[in-house]
């Protein structure tokens, strides 16, 4: 079976989304959160579907909505048995650095929670590599670098820190720079993700993504690594189970 380590399940199609995944041998979906509301939604989904597990956290684009008074609510959610990680958290300077200090402050709050509850973290990092690395080094956490798109040098830094690299639909894009990275790292350090409903793999690029597309990403990875799809499935599933303690 496959595991989708990173999805945002649309609530209006949740039943068909999960069923489509199961039909395509994607038997576990780890649903991410972007704020307090979606954290509650994610936990509700996990409580509804055996195949779904939840992460809770605040995405860097939503830090202005975060209130410190929300922390007890996140702590309560983290005690739910189906919450397997803190995420999606991190830093995003793509649109500028005007809220950089606030992003870093909120990022640190959730890294502290991850330490406190012994949970892995799911990291969003865009145009913020060095800040992300330096801050992560201050905490005793491991996890997944979501939608990894950096250089081989950066990949090796994260790997040495104990992180897995989340590889998704971008790998299937023509002229993807990820080709050279995945060829030069071990599959022991890779997990598969869709980031549904975003970043659909070819030939569905531009259409809403679903967890059912994980095997397409796996097939692409198997070709680049020169190994069987079954080996990709078994190893990435084992990696996902290891980091999420499934």
Features from the language model and the residues they span:
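Mid-domain alpha/beta scaffold segments of enzyme catalytic cores
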Residues: 1-246
């Amino acid at each position: 079976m496959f595991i989708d380590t990173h999805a945002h399940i649309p609530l209006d199609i949740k039943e068909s989304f999960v069923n489509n995944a199961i039909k395509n041998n994607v038997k576990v979906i780890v649903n991410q959160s972007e704020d307090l509301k979606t954290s509650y939604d994610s936990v509700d989904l996990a409580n509804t579907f055996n195949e779904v597990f939840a992460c809770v956290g605040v995405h860097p684009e939503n830090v202005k909505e975060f209130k410190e008074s929300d922390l007890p609510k996140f702590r309560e959610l983290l005690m739910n048995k189906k919450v397997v990680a803190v995420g999606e958290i991190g830093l995003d300077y793509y649109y500028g650095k005007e809220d950089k200090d606030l992003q870093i402050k909120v990022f640190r709050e959730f890294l502290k929670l991850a330490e406190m509850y012994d949970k892995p973290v799911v990291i969003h990092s865009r145009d913020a590599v060095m800040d992300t690395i330096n801050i992560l080094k201050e905490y005793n956490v491991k996890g997944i670098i979501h939608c990894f798109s950096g250089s081989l040098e950066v990949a090796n830094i994260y790997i040495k820190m104990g992180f897995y690299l989340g590889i998704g639909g971008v790998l299937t894009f023509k002229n993807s720079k990820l080709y050279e990275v995945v060829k030069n790292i071990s599959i022991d350090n890779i997990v598969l993700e869709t980031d549904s409903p975003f970043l659909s793999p070819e030939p569905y690029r531009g259409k809403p993504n679903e967890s059912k597309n994980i095997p397409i990403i796996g097939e692409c990875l198997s070709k680049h690594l020169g190994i069987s799809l079954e080996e990709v499935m078994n190893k990435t599933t084992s990696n996902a189970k290891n980091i999420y303690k499934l």
